[in-house]
Each structure stands twice: as structure tokens, then as C-alpha cells.
Amino acid sequence: MTNSARDFATSIKPTVLVVDDSTMMTSLAARILGKDYNVLTASSGEECLELLKTKKPHLILLDVTMKGMDGFAVLKALKSNAKTAPIPVIFMTSDENNETEIRSLNEGAVDFITKPFIPGIFLRRVKNTIELSLLQKNLQFEVNVQTEKFKKLTRQIMLALSGTVDAKDHYTKGHSFRVAKYSVEIARRLGYSEQNQEDIYAMGLLHDVGKIGVAGDIIRKDTKLTDEEYQNIKEHTITGYNILKTITALPGLAIGARWHHERFD
């Protein structure tokens, strides 16, 4: 467990929701868990779902056989709701049928406890499940942070490359940025996904990167180009393609550079 996950786990008292139509079982679970956890109880599946509209426990202990909604019906409802789906669920039952245990795990429960349970084992399995859940959340947070850092770095590199082209061709200064900006706005209005918009933005920024391979005196020439010079200019699409084709994570970059002067008509 990472330090940040451990610190978080120890800085708050996690909440456990116990769902069982037996008051004896909910009382027993509350006594065992009460020292280390905030314990909420519900005597039916319906009450459980109603309670979850305002509460978000770290773990749900769910009885399988209850009047009205049984445990499987409750679990299905939990997993179909984006707000409750991430909450880990441990099934509790006096049924020692292996098929019940297999079904519960297949349908999304993280563990299965047979009643009557041994207090020490019961407490340890609850603790392990909550710690694992907190660790997974912490890891996901770290992944998201690193992903955002990578995206930021990637965009900075792309801006630097497009800036290099602009520095060489002062007649079209800011051209690549404007192309990227207008392209992503068109994509947004067409209903493209956020990821597709980001990809199109990158293609716009780097579509002219091949001009790096064109001689500066040709790019900056303010008189008519010779046939040879014009041919040299046209080759910037191929140069750009060769520069960007190694970026296999986003093949659209190379495609955009290679064909951005082609016309559909």
C-alpha cells in the first residue's frame, strides 16, 4: 500500500453498510466493526438503495437471501448505477452452495462470507477489501495525474515543433496554430469526441512540420519560385510524413502531414 493510500485510510474512519433482513446479524456485524468503522444498516434491498441516494460507503456487506429484493437483485442495481458501481460488495449467506458463491463473484461481488462468521476472520476480510479499494483508487489517481502531465508535455513539444516551422517561415507565422484551432472547432461542432478533437488539434499543429527540411532562402523568397524551388516546397509533405510516421500511437499525424494539400474534388 502506498504512503498516500495508507495516510488516507488512517485519516478517516471508513463507512461500511450492512444489509440483512436479520436484525441479529446487522447488530452482530455492527458490534464487530464498530470500533474501526462507521456502520450503517439496512434491513432490505429497497432500504439499501434508498440509503445510497445520500450515503456513499466504502464497502457494502450484502445478504443473499432477503425478502423482496434478494442480494443478486440489489447487486445488479448497484452495478447498473455509475455512482454505486465502484463500491465493493461482499456477499454474506448461510448457504454453503458453491454455485451461489460462484454466481456472486461472477456478478461483481469481491468476496463471499459464510454465516455464522468468525469475528476475527470477518473483520480481517472487511479490512483487506477496504484497503485494496483505497489502494486502487489511489493508483487510478496517480495514473490520471501522470497522464495529464504526459498530455501537457506532448502539447508543449508539438507547440515547440510548430514554433520551429513558424520561425523559419515568418510569412505564415502562427499558421499551424490557427489551423489546429479552427480544425478542432469544426470537429467540436460536428460532435467529435474529446479524444478525437485532441488528435485533430495535434494534426493541425504538425501538418507543416516538413517545412523544416526546406531551405530557408526558398521559404522566405519574396519573388516567384523556379520550377526546382517549387518542387522542393512541395516535398515538405513527404518530409513531414517521414518525420511523423514513427509516432505510431497517433498515425493521423503522419497522414495529415502527407496529404494536407490534397483536395477531395
Task: List the model feature ranges, each with a label.
Residues M66, S104:
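Receiver (REC) domain active-site loop signature in two-component systems and cognate sites
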Residues S162-D265:
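Metal-dependent catalytic cores of enzymes that make or break cyclic nucleotides
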Residues P116-V126, I130:
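C-terminal output helix
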Residues K55-L61:
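Active-site beta3 strand of CheY-like receiver
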Residues S22-T41:
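Two-component/phosphorelay signaling modules centered on CheY-like receiver
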